UniProtKB/Swiss-Prot annotation:
This is UPF0111 protein TC_0063. Belongs to the UPF0111 family.
Amino acid sequence: MQVLASLFGRSPFSPLQAHVELVSASIEVLFPLFSAIKEGDYQRVEALAQLVSSKERQADGVKNDIRSHLASGVFIPVSRLAMLEIISTQDSVADCAEDIAILLTVKELRFYPEFEEIFFQFLQKTVQSFEVVAKAIREMDLLLESSFGGCRAEKTRVLVNEVSNLEHECDLLQRELMKILFSENFSIETKDFVLWTQIIKRLSGISNNSEKLAYRVGMTLEEK
């Protein structure tokens, strides 16, 4: 709590940025996780899954501390509701990442050649959608310096639109993946089918929440 208080003293957005770094750290593990699945390195899968869970727990702790500080009346230049919505949505991204990590440890899952390539495209776009909105969060101090206007605000709007476009691309790739999984010509073990559909759903949750987060950041500009 004392550490967080010092962050609030440095900048009203520093705690939010500290939280987004932990969420980002959990998202960054997804590529190595799925690469380990591809290589059949299940010990590495277990180790990386534990790392994701550790980052998610740390993010939860920061989230709860931020909520406590907001309740105590600390000054912030945006509405408390906006701040709470942003932190909650960020945390939902970390939750999705942890869910994926847990699902990957349920059994020794494998890729099927019919969807491996498109899956990694889907994964790349999903991770990218969060990376873009995380960039907007990291630059909120600069927004404050510009009084939420000018070129800095326009740059943030561009990032918000980029996230929306990426989320749409994720939707299209998700649809293609589901078509493959449900195709009558595609053969897959029942347990694998259940796990892959759940994994795809959780990955979609990351891009959906990234879009929600970007929208909320964009709304802070309109509220000024």
